[in-house]
Every structure is written in C-alpha cells, then in structure tokens.
From Swiss-Prot:
It is found in: Cell inner membrane. The chain crosses the membrane at residues 17-37, 42-62, 80-100, 109-129. Belongs to the fluoride channel Fluc/FEX (TC 1.A.43) family. This is Fluoride-specific ion channel FluC 1. It comes from Bradyrhizobium diazoefficiens (strain JCM 10833 / BCRC 13528 / IAM 13628 / NBRC 14792 / USDA 110). Pfam families: CRCB (PF02537). One of its GO terms (cellular component) is plasma membrane. Keywords: Cell inner membrane, Cell membrane, Ion channel, Ion transport, Membrane, Metal-binding, Sodium, Transmembrane, Transmembrane helix, Transport. Fluoride-specific ion channel. Important for reducing fluoride concentration in the cell, thus reducing its toxicity. It is a multi-pass membrane protein.
Length: 142
C-alpha cells in the first residue's frame, strides 16, 4: 500500500483549493454577466456569450501556458483558470435547460438555431483563443 506523504497531501489539498477558488470566481462572473446580458424570453444570448467567451479563454490560456507557450504557469494556476474558472463560468447545464425550454415552448426553430450557433460559436472561440495565444507566443520576448 502506497501512503501519500504529508507534503503530497498538502499539495493535493492546495490544488483542490485553487480549483474551488477558480470555480467561485467563474460562477460569480457568470452570474454577473448573465444579469448584464439578460434579454428575457427567447434566444438565450447571455448563455451563448458566456460559453463563447469561456471557450475563448480556455483556448487562449491552454495554448499560452502549454508546452510551446510563452508563459510558464504552475499546475495549480492552470487548474485555477482552466478547471476552476472556466468550469464555473461556462454552463452546459444552462444551455441544455434553455434548449429544452425553447423546444417545450414550441420554439423549435429557435432551439435548433441556438444549438447550431452555440456549437459553431464555441468551436470558433476555442480556435480563436488558440490562434491569438499562438501568435502571442511567437512574439519576441522583451
């Protein structure tokens, strides 16, 4: 049986704390952005925007701090941003509920447009984040 040392347990606890803190910040940010962009019934622009910007952030940060990235980030900082913040900020569950409500409310074409535009927007956002960070990574360091 391999028992983790107290240092390993401390590192694990700190990583959990970083992810938790990122989740809190991401969740609060999502709530505030959702309030600011709430357009009422119909097409859920706030959730589309939140998931698109979250995809942009994770694509940018993953590339910026990846093996070929310009920025060296500690594992706990990557987990804070990518797992914690982006996980707390983006919301597939809200997307699912909004899509269900649109279908259930008889707005089938709006629901289909929402699903299609969301998937395209998220993928384009991750790609744009990656491209932006890749270009930044190639800049001369000062």
């Amino acid at each position: 049986m391999n028992v983790p040392s107290s240092a390993e347990r401390w590192r694990s606890a700190m990583l959990y704390a970083w992810v938790s803190a990122g989740s809190v910040v991401g969740g609060l940010t999502r709530y505030l952005v959702g309030l600011a962009l709430d357009t009422g019934p119909g097409f859920p622009f706030a959730t589309l925007f939140i998931n698109a910007t979250g995809s942009l952030i994770i694509g940018f940060y993953a590339t910026l701090t990846g093996p070929d990235g310009r920025m060296l980030a500690r594992p706990e900082h990557r987990q804070f941003v990518m797992t914690g913040f982006c996980g707390g900020y983006t919301t597939f569950s809200a997307f699912s509920l909004e899509t269900f409500r649109l279908f259930h409310g008889g707005m089938k074409y709006i629901a289909l447009a929402y699903v299609a535009s969301s998937v395209v927007c998220w993928l384009v956002s991750v790609w744009l984040g990656h491209i932006m960070a890749s270009r930044y990574n190639r800049l001369k360091r000062s």
